[in-house]
A protein has these predicted regions:
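Conserved MFS/SLC helix-loop-helix module at the cytosolic interface between two early adjacent transmembrane helices
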Residues: 65-101
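Paired small-residue
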Residues: 93, 104-112, 296-304
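Structural signature of the two symmetry-related core transmembrane helices
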Residues: 81-95, 176, 273-288
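C-terminal membrane-cytosol helix-exit motif in multi-pass small-molecule transporters
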Residues: 176-195, 377-382
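Residue-level signature of mid-helix packing/kink "hotspots" within the transmembrane helices
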Residues: 60-68, 152-153, 255-260, 344-345
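Helix-breaking motifs and short loop linkers at transmembrane-helix boundaries and internal kinks
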Residues: 46, 78, 99-104, 270, ...
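Cytoplasmic helix-loop-helix junction between adjacent transmembrane helices
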Residues: 109-148
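Helix-to-loop junctions at the C-terminal end of transmembrane segments
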Residues: 66-78, 258-271
């Protein structure tokens, strides 16, 4: 009966819409600079493919180092302070991108963006799970990820449009304004009453162990995203498409469709099965892009890739949250999302090196290989969970057979 009551608890409330709206403005800001940074490095600063990979990926270096800390802070002091401070730091740092036409200066500003990104994402994503009934948590994560991937998908279209009309300086201003809007919306959010954390021996680790396995799979699967966002804006010139607008519009539209109409998929199939579907679709999409070097190949590959990217994050986060106490949600999100940062930071460097030696299609192929490797990670994670379950059941039997005096 309790389960029925929780399921009837409304999810799409004004409070939920406010935090998702803040997230969309924020990720639209990040998405706006996605096509601008590679082109700015290559055409204005004279950098090569490795420099592009570093400039794109270094944002996530600061984020990956900070996320576990801010996850613990969010569990102790609340989510709103992370949301507001993170978005504010991002707004200021993006405005600095064009202050000095220097690659080292840009890299420094990108690291600062990463620090703000870590705080905002952990605060907002954790508040989303705070607001959701347990049985609808996968659905809530899916709606939240509409904001994440919708912003990252449609932001590049806005960025390309602004570059064509007003140049790089205008892109930094537009992105900074969107991040500032996210901070304002975040200011009007309210904290959710949460279970009180109880100190348990062995649970004071910086990295939350429940999130490490699913996070490692996320890392492997999302290196494809690093290849897609870094090199599609440059690859379109090679195949005569001219602009990446249509590719990012296709990607964004499909992400929205899957996330909205397939929001219950992770809850229905479970995190592991949904993760398998996501990895399979991602692998197929990146393989098509790598082997079919035409406009049609890029568009067909994008369809499969978008479907996979839509499901991967909510499926694996649901898996991670199911392994941890309710009092550790912030810590789980912080640790889990660190692997997202790692995939985009280290992943951008990896695909940048591959692109320097094997071209942009080689970078897409690397994304396919890493996504396929995610199946191994899921299998290992499932095996370990079964082993722990068996050991727990055996201990329970022993305790029953030999009760304490």
């Amino acid at each position: 009966m309790a389960s029925v009551d929780r399921r009837r608890t409304p999810l799409l409330t004004p409070r939920f819409a406010l935090i998702v709206g803040s997230g969309f403005a924020y990720f639209l800001a990040l998405g706006t600079v996605l096509p601008a940074v590679p082109q700015y490095v290559k055409h204005r600063l004279g950098g090569g493919d490795v420099s592009v990979g570093v400039a794109v990926g270094v944002l996530f270096v600061g984020a990956v180092l900070l996320r576990p800390y801010v996850g613990r802070l969010g569990d102790r002091f609340g989510r709103r302070v992370l949301i507001v401070s993170g978005a504010t730091v991002v707004a200021v740092s993006v405005l600095l991108y064009g202050a000095v036409e220097s690659l080292p200066f840009l890299i420094g500003a990108r690291i600062l963006t990463g620090l703000g990104e870590a705080a905002f994402f952990v605060g907002a994503a954790t508040m989303v799970t705070d607001l959701a009934p347990v049985e609808r948590r996968g659905e809530a994560i899916s709606y939240w990820s509409v904001a994440v991937y919708g912003g990252l998908a449609f932001g590049p279209v806005l960025g390309e449009t602004v570059i064509d009309a007003r140049g790089y300086g205008a892109v930094w201003v537009v992105a900074g304004a969107l991040a500032a809007l996210a901070a304002v919306l975040g200011f009007f959010t309210r904290e959710v009453e949460r279970p009180v954390a109880v100190s348990v021996p062995g649970r004071g680790h910086l990295l939350n162990r429940a999130a490490i396995g699913p996070g490692a799979v996320l890392f492997s699967g999302l290196i494809a995203l690093a290849a897609f966002t870094a090199f599609v804006p440059l690859y379109v010139d090679d195949i005569g498409l001219g602009s990446a607008d249509v590719v990012f519009l296709l990607y964004g539209g499909l992400v929205l469709v899957v996330r909205i109409f397939g929001a219950r998929i992770p809850d229905t199939l479970g995190g592991r099965r949904s993760g398998v579907l996501a990895l399979a679709s991602t692998t197929i999409g990146m393989t098509v892009m790598a082997l079919w070097g035409t406009t049609a190949g890029l568009l067909v590959g994008t369809v499969f890739f978008a479907a996979g990217a839509s499901l991967l994050y909510p499926a694996l986060l649901l898996l991670a949250l199911g392994n941890a106490p309710e009092t550790e949600r912030g810590s789980v999100v912080g640790t889990f999302s660190s692997f997202f940062d790692l995939s985009q930071g280290l992943g951008s460097l990896i695909v940048g090196l591959v692109a320097a030696g094997g071209g942009y299609r080689g970078a897409f192929g690397a994304g396919a290989v890493f996504a396929a490797a995610g199946f191994v990670g899921l299998a290992v994670h499932a095996s370990r969970r079964r082993s722990r379950r068996v050991r727990t059941e055996e201990l329970g039997v022993l305790a029953t057979e030999h009760p304490a005096p």
